[in-house]
Amino acid sequence: VQQITYSVLMDKHSLQAQIDALTRLHGAAECEIGVLTRFDIPELAQLSLAAYGERPTLEAQAEATDEMRLCFEGVFGTPLEGSFLGAWVDGNLVAAIIVVVDPPVEEPSGLPQVIDLMVHPNFRRRGIATALVAECARRCQDWGASSLIVRIDEANAHLPHVYDIFQESDNCAQA
């Protein structure tokens, strides 16, 4: 029986799911998943702008690039080995998931937390985000984590689709 509860914390929605359930998710086979590096920051910044519907002005590109750089520097939480994953289709970055431990706005839990999950609008509803979550869950097992926390800002227009992914795992609690 799936247990679902819900609350809003500081304009963010929270989900927590057991790793075992998430590893059983099936996502898109059309994408290649790999670890993002600092060399991917420019493309990751462009993806962020597209995913969040922002116009790609020079100022917006500079801000998105700075934000991605700060993610890699650990400003938004401590990155784990291979915890920033991307999905590529035909050599183009079309989706990304960013996972950290102990983001500064939360009480330290030691659990991995998804702080961003973005998919280019042209590639949504194809299972790519699901594939990223499943791969992230497998990596969480390698890190010794038993669950994964997701915090998504209410402003993310695709929040319902993120919830769909986690509810598919049949072992998800919203906190």
Stretches found by the model and what they are:
Residues Q46-A62, V75:
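Helix-loop element at the rim of GNAT/NAT acetyltransferase active sites that forms part
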Residues E32-Q46, T57:
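A short beta-loop-alpha structural element at the N-terminal edge
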Residues C140-I152:
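Conserved GNAT acetyl-CoA-binding A-motif
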Residues I149-P160, D164:
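Conserved beta-strand-loop-alpha-helix junction that forms the acyl-donor binding cleft
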Residues V1-C31, P160, N171-A175:
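Acyl-donor-binding surface of acyltransferase catalytic domains
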Residues F84-G86, N92-V101, Q113, M118:
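Conserved beta-strand in the GNAT
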Residues D116-V119, R125-R138, D142, D164-I165:
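Conserved acetyl-CoA-binding loop-helix of GNAT-fold acetyltransferases
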Residues A60-F84, W88-V89, I98:
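Active-site rim helix/loop that mediates acceptor-substrate recognition in acyltransferases
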